Structures are given as C-alpha cells and as structure tokens.
C-alpha cells in the first residue's frame, strides 16, 4: 500500500508497530463555502441496507497524494525498472543541453490562444493517470542521487539508475492500487488494508459518503457511496486512534498527522496518489463500486476481485489504447502479442514472476503524454459547470486548483485559509456524462501537443516540503531535467533500436526541422537530431493533429501495456472460457462492460 506520493518526495517503509489505545475521534470541523458538515456519519451509515453498493459506505481507503512524503508499506522485494535499450545513445551532455532543456520547458508552459480541444474525452486523461499509478511508482520521487535535478547535473550511469530505482508497484495491471493488500506489508498498512474491507459484508470494499453542501448533489449515484473512505470516519468509529497515529515512525506519521492534528480528510486507499486530484479520486470510487457490483451478482471477494481486474485490463487494451494511440499500431501490437515487450522481458527476467519489469522509456517519458491532455478547468457538474434546470451554478467551471483542493491533500477546502473538511462535499460529486464524450469545450481533453495548461507550471499540492526548489512545481522543467538525469535514450536513437529489431513496420523519424520548428534554440546543442524522448512523443502527436499519439509514442505505450497483460499468467488474456479468451461479452452477453461508459452505467454512475 502506498500511503501518499507527492512529487519530489522520499520513500518511507512502514515498520512501526501498532499500539492501540482507546480514544474518541475528534468531531468533524465545519466546512467553508463549497464544503459542508457531515453530522454523525457513522449513525447514518449503519442504517444502510446490506445488499446494494450503498451497504459499503462505511469506508476505508487511505490516501493523501499531496503530502510531502510518500510512504510505502511493502517489505518484500520490489519490482524493477529497466531500459528497453541500454546502449541506445542519450542526449548530448553538458551545460548547453541543460540550458536548452530549461528554455524548452519555458516554451512549453506558454499559454496560447488556441484552446487545444481534442476529440478525446476527458475521462481518458485520468484513466491514464489511474493506470500509471497502478503499475509504476518511484521514477519521480526522492531517491538519493537519482532525484537530483536542480542546478548543474549530468546524466547518470544507466547501471546505477537501474540499481537505484525500484518499482514500488507490481508492474502488472492487477489493481493493487485499488485493493492495497499486497503481501509483506508493515503492521499499520496491514491494518488499513483490512479496514478497507467492509466489517460486516466482508466481500465488499468500503466507500465513503459525501458531506451536505447545502446546494444539493448530482442525482447519480442514487446511493450515498460517492466518496472515498477517509481517516476521520475511522477515528470517529474508534477503528484507528490518535495514539496509534502518533506512535508511527515520524516519516510515516506525517502522512496522517500534521501540526493541526490528524488529517481527517486523508483517504484510506491502496495508493494515495489516487486522491491527489478529484477526477482520479472519483474514478477510484467507480472501480471500488465495480468490485462491489460483482459481489452483488453473487461473487465472493476473490472472484469479484478477479472479475474487476479482468474488466479493467480489457478496458485498458480495448478502450484506452484505441482512444489515445494510432489504431494501426494498436492492432499490430495486439495481433503479435507485444513482441517488443517479450524481448525486453527475456532480457530482464524478474526474480519474482508476479512482478514484471517496467521500461524506463515508458515510465519516465512515453506515458507522460497525458500531462499535455490536462485542461485548466472542466465542466465538472451542474454546480461547477453548465447548470441544469433546478440547479444553481456556483462557478462556470471547476478549475484545476479546486480539483486539487477538494481532495484529502487539499483538506476539502477551497483555499488554505478556510476550515478543513473531512468528506467530499456533495456538490463536488462528478457528473460523468460530461467526461465521457468530447462534444463541447471543457468536455474534451486538450490536444496532445507541446504545450501544457498554465496550472501545470505551478502545480498545486506539489513540492510542499520547506526548502523545495520552485522548479519542482514546474512540470515541464521537472520532466525534461529528470529524463536527462536518468539518461533516457534520445527519441531518434530509440526509434533506430526498435526498427533494428524488425518486429514491426519501420517507425518513421521526424526531421530535425520538424522537431525544432518554432524552437531554433534546440539546433545548436543538437537536440533537433537527438531529442528528449518526452518532448518528441508530444511533438510527433502534435504533427498528426493531437487527437492521438504518433508512431513512437503509440509503440511505447501499446507495447508496454499490452505486454504487461500478455505476460501476466493471471490476466484476462490468459483466461479461457470454453476454449475462448475471456471477454466482457462472454461474462455478461446481454450487457457487456465493454467501454468506460458501460462500466460507469453498471456501477450506477451514468444513466
């Protein structure tokens, strides 16, 4: 279980012993405007019926994606990050390259008049982030030596990088970010994982309820289970005590306690990063509800988990990838079973077959294309977006800053001067029908291009530790410098290496002029011909219209995600029903969960 992960933070292992001491949790503090008081939530929850999803709103999932420390509770051997091609040349080293990278970051952060609307629905932006959190953790965290990206830096030796970076995820699409019960956890993480299961209906996962905002709530879901379970609820029930929190190792304790006492808004979930912004948090709620709906169909916990994983994996390969990659590349990689990843796996056999190696080129660069898809604000719901009959608009859209504020890390308050809250206010529940189509402005993702929305140049809830350099809040600069420090192959070198395998049709290479157009400063240090991989992935997508990745980006993303599923013995790909590969259509022929829309309908979140 990853308790909290915020950018530029160190890793802490949970080894503290629990010391239970009876104590009453403090009362819920009042909320500021946009939030509300949830009076006596335990009493309301105990009245819920045992059968439907609403029976599990007693909650337990812990996360604080915006805290200054990421704490990890796994004590078994971690997974591995490895280079796809260790010998592929990197960027030219030296001060001229660093200066050009910083100038490149500045150019990417400029707000343009073009709104950048894509034909991609916003849900894919945050489904991508959810996937990333499920399969990788560590490449952008505080690791001595490797995480030094400020000032004059040089590329690290690749052997040192591989030896110094551990993947704190399984490296498979197994939803350990949802269930949080990986083997070998410390005592406190083990207790939290147990609390994530409903105490009475033990096959179900707990969820939380929303607070009364005074403005009403969107009509879906029809039951109260619309939030993650949070620390305040567990404190009020006595499931966790302040004494237990105070007895934790200091680095672990700061994820749950600050100068004002317990962080009551802290979500208790398998990966704290999934509560770093509200859109990912609400998607996490959807997958918890998916598990619980499987239980409603009569499946026990393990079978419900297996079916939830299968549907998730199927959606990644058959909904997410076609939505963001060049479809001819996806078709080619699916038809051949991702041989590029298979060769990578042969070169990097894992010590634990349950933990697949992760390509650094994917994690550090290729899969960060989603940063370009982030909007500065969204048509979130009828209160923070386009109103509907009978509703009162509070704001014309939900700003990026507010979507970070109404999380555990933001303490459910519109600004730091407001009183903190515990639960998500009801008027902040997402209306998913605004996120699954790309029909109107603020109801689509931004195009995948070489510009980032202005809020990504001053990241909220990031780098909050005193003394953290300002650049840690600047996403483009952080990505470019980290890629340089971790000695990523240049994009052109990577294309040459992939093409040399002969596994696929040749990947075309952008000309130096196509790379440097409008950015002549890339020419002198040679970055037009040996280009930072992250920037190149965005640039080639930009040149094909920005509605999907280009050839290299599509290959990196499709080969990795398909390869993880194909090479996981427990995945849907390797499960058979009457001789046929498992699919949602075989599981539920009349109403298959074969799209994100179908999943949201099945979970009661979309009409």
Summary of predicted features, one role per range:
Residues 273-276, 280-289, 293-297:
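Fold-level signature of zinc-dependent metallopeptidase catalytic domains
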């Amino acid at each position: 279980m990853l308790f909290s992960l915020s950018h530029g933070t160190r890793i802490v292992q949970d080894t503290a012993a629990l010391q239970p001491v009876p104590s009453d949790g403090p009362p819920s503090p009042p909320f500021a405007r946009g939030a509300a008081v949830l009076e006596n939530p335990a009493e309301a929850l105990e009245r819920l019926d045992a059968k439907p999803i609403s029976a599990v709103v007693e909650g337990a999932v812990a996360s604080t994606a915006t805290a200054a420390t990421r704490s990890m509770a796994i004590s078994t051997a971690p997974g591995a990050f490895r280079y796809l091609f260790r010998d592929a040349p990197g960027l030219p080293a030296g001060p001229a390259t660093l200066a050009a990278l910083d100038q490149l970051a500045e150019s990417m952060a400029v707000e343009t008049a073009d709104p950048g609307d894509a034909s991609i629905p916003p849900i894919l932006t945050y489904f991508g982030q959810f996937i990333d959190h499920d399969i990788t953790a560590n490449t952008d965290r505080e690791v001595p030596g490797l995480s030094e990206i400020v000032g004059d830096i040089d590329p690290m030796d690749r052997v040192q990088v591989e030896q110094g970076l551990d993947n704190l995820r399984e490296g498979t699409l197994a939803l350990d970010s949802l269930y949080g019960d990986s083997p070998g956890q410390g005592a406190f993480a083990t207790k939290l994982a147990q609390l994530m299961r409903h105490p009475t209906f033990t096959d179900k996962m707990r969820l939380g309820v929303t607070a009364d905002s005074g403005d009403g709530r969107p009509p879906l879901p029809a039951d109260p289970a619309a939030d993650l379970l949070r620390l305040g609820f567990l404190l009020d029930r006595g499931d966790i005590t302040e004494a237990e929190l105070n007895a934790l190792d200091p680095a672990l304790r700061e994820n749950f306690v600050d100068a004002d006492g317990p962080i009551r808004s802290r979500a208790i979930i398998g990966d704290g990063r999934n509560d770093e912004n509200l859109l990912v948090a609400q998607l996490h709620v959807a997958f918890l509800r998916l598990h619980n709906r499987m239980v409603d169909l009569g499946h026990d916990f393990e079978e419900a988990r297996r079916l939830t994983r299968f549907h998730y994996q199927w959606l990644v390969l058959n909904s997410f990838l076609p939505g963001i990659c060049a479809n001819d590349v996806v078709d080619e990689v699916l038809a051949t079973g991702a041989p590029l990843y298979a060769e990578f796996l042969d070169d990097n056999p894992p010590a634990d077959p349950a933990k697949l190696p992760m390509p650094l080129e994917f994690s550090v660069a290729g899969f960060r294309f989603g940063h370009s898809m982030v909007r500065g604000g969204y048509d979130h719901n009828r209160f923070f977006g386009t109103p509907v009959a009978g509703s009162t608009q509070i704001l014309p859209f939900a700003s990026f800053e507010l979507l970070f504020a109404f999380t555990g890390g933001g303490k459910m308050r519109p600004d730091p001067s407001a009183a903190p809250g515990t639960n998500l206010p009801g008027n902040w529940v997402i209306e998913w029908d605004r996120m699954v189509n790309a029909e109107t402005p603020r109801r689509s993702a931004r195009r995948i291009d070489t510009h980032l929305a202005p809020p990504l140049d001053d990241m909220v809830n990031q780098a909050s530790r005193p003394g953290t350099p300002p650049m840690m809040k600047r996403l483009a600069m952080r990505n470019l410098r980290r890629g340089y420090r971790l000695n990523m192959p240049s994009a052109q070198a990577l294309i040459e290496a992939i093409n040399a395998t002969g596994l696929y049709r040749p990947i075309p290479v952008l000309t130096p002029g196509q790379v440097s157009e409008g950015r002549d400063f890339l020419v002198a240090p040679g970055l037009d011909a040996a280009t930072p991989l992250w920037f190149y992935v965005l640039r080639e997508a930009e040149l094909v219209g920005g509605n999907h990745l280009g050839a290299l980006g599509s290959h990196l993303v499709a080969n990795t995600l398909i390869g993880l599923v194909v090479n996981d013995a427990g995945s849907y790909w390797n499960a058979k029903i009457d001789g046929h590969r498992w699919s949602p259509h075989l599981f539920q022929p009349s109403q298959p969960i074969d799209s994100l829309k179908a999943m949201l309908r099945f979970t009661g979140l979309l009409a």
